[in-house]
């Protein structure tokens, strides 16, 4: 019977880790981290079954070389405590052949990560005895690439606005046009004993006092309606 195991970790310079070292371990290879001059050698590690670099169409072709890719990431992140990459470790069904395991991983990575502009580096490790514990390592860039092949921000604020009773979210870049189209930012106002988000025009008409000067925003980009639903009080009660 197939088992389920998925572990997600952050590769952070603040924790003493590097993306180059993680990629060298994943690929069982020797790589030089140009950021600190440290060479990481995992060529003696056994059990490598497959490895591949996945790039969006806008990525530089030379990033197919994983050492070049992850050194580019290290160069971009200059802070001493930078988050460099996301790392996933997932168990693979032993019932599947190696070819099907690879196909499963390729489809998953392309659909879930590369389609959103992320670069990914993946490998299958199958330690001795073979077939006993096959698992996948996936190393993912924290920043996506834009249509010009440039790194985007790790996080992006989204302003939630209202117009004619409809609520929508806009990034900072989109808000100027949204404002011209009549959309209003929402702020917190005191309504009785509660704090309620609404537009300034609606609050002024009802005489409510604003309690926050900051507009409503989602800290980490566009809201995921599925996640929001399953984290709602209603769903928690049902659970």
Task: Please identify what each model-predicted range represents.
Residues 1-239:
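N-terminal nicking endonuclease/strand-transfer module with a His-rich metal-binding environment
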